[in-house]
């Protein structure tokens, strides 16, 4: 004779809370499992997959041709000569922040052609 699920549920329903806790503990030991709830991280995983839309262009080093780099920085940012020179001399420094990927890549290419070392973050 086999015991049905209905009979098992009826037997558990008649148990006290302490008896149910002991039953769960015994089942965990016998089957090598844990009754702990699994952690679900749905929204956090979706945020990690989200693609970055804003980038910062960082001048890591001016390189050998500092004058050309200063001109490129002035053209890209609209800074005056003194401000652009200070930015280039203060490398590593942020040239532009929160720009699109296309704009960041174009600026990186322009600065690298002038001889600078550039990072896009």
UniProtKB/Swiss-Prot annotation:
GO molecular function terms attached to this record: mRNA binding; structural constituent of ribosome
Segments forming a coiled coil: none
InterPro entries: Ribosomal_bL12 (IPR000206), Ribosomal_bL12_C (IPR013823), Ribosomal_bL12_C/ClpS-like (IPR014719), Ribosomal_bL12_oligo (IPR008932), Ribosomal_bL12_oligo_N_sf (IPR036235)
Cellular component GO terms, alphabetical: cytosolic large ribosomal subunit
Alphabetized Gene3D superfamilies for the sequence: 3.30.1390.10, Single helix bin
Top-level lineage group: Bacteria
Cystine residue pairs: none
Alphabetized Pfam families for the sequence: Ribosomal_L12, Ribosomal_L12_N
UniProtKB keywords: Ribonucleoprotein, Ribosomal protein
Biological process (GO), any one: translation
Oligomer and partners: Homodimer. Part of the ribosomal stalk of the 50S ribosomal subunit. Forms a multimeric L10(L12)X complex, where L10 forms an elongated spine to which 2 to 4 L12 dimers bind in a sequential fashion. Binds GTP-bound translation factors.
Function summary: Forms part of the ribosomal stalk which helps the ribosome interact with GTP-bound translation factors. Is thus essential for accurate translation.
PANTHER family: 39S RIBOSOMAL PROTEIN L12, LARGE RIBOSOMAL SUBUNIT PROTEIN BL12M
Family statement drawn from the similarity comment of this UniProt entry: Belongs to the bacterial ribosomal protein bL12 family.
Protein's name in the database: Large ribosomal subunit protein bL12
Organism in which the protein naturally occurs: Vibrio cholerae serotype O1 (strain ATCC 39315 / El Tor Inaba N16961)
Gene assigned in the entry: rplL
């Amino acid at each position: 004779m086999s015991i049905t699920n209905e009979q098992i549920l009826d037997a558990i329903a008649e148990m006290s809370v302490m008896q149910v806790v002991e039953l769960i503990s015994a089942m965990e030991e016998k089957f090598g499992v844990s009754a702990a709830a699994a952690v679900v991280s749905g929204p956090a995983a979706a945020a990690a997959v989200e693609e970055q839309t804003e980038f910062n262009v960082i001048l890591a080093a001016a390189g050998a041709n500092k004058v050309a780099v200063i001109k490129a920085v002035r053209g890209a940012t609209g800074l005056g000569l003194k401000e652009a020179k200070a930015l280039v001399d203060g490398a590593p420094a942020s040239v532009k922040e929160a720009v699109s990927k296309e704009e960041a890549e174009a600026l990186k290419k322009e600065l690298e052609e002038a001889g600078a070392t550039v990072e896009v973050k």
